[in-house]
Amino acid sequence: MKLHELQPAAGSRKAPKRVGRGTGSGLGRNAGKGEKGQNARSGGGVRPGFEGGQMPLYRRLPKRGFTNIFAKRYVSINVDRLNIFENGTEITPEVLLERRVVSKVLDGVKILGNGNLEKSLIVKGCKFSKSAIEKIEAAGGKVEVI
């Protein structure tokens, strides 16, 4: 098979509805827009959320909370994700980013204790849960808490 021979699966592509092209087509005359009124006009219709003049839901409900601009956001990973490294490797957030264990480092990396760790590693510059520290040290590794 060549690139120019590729075809969509049978029945997966529907022909577009061509409206306003004569009464014989079944979609002539009013082109599926009914009779007169706001929705029959060009550009007709109401904006999203408009409820006919009634106070809309998004304005009836009160505002709640705020965004703390000082909040620290951490990317969390589990200890079993660290098994891709060799024994004795020094792991930092930069190394995790480089090896694509994490896609971005926001305000840091937090390592959680889900799963098992089989490698002895030195982990620096991260935050840890208690269970993660226990598992890293049980595997013969070291933890340097920030």
Swiss-Prot record:
InterPro entries: Ribosomal_uL15 (IPR030878), Ribosomal_uL15/eL18 (IPR021131), Ribosomal_uL15/eL18_sf (IPR036227), Ribosomal_uL15_bac-type (IPR005749), Ribosomal_uL15_CS (IPR001196). Binds to the 23S rRNA. GO terms for cellular component: cytosolic large ribosomal subunit. Keywords: Ribonucleoprotein, Ribosomal protein, RNA-binding, rRNA-binding. Belongs to the universal ribosomal protein uL15 family. NCBIfam families: rplO_bact. The gene is rplO. Residues 1-54 are annotated as: Disordered. It comes from the Bacteria. The keyword Ligase does not apply. Pfam families: Ribosomal_L27A. The keyword Ribonucleoprotein applies. PANTHER family: 50S RIBOSOMAL PROTEIN L15 (PTHR12934), LARGE RIBOSOMAL SUBUNIT PROTEIN UL15M (PTHR12934:SF11). Gene3D superfamilies: 3.100.10.10. This is Large ribosomal subunit protein uL15. HAMAP family: Ribosomal_uL15. Residues 21-31, 42-52 have a biased composition (Gly residues). Part of the 50S ribosomal subunit. One of its GO terms (biological process) is translation. One of its GO terms (molecular function) is structural constituent of ribosome.
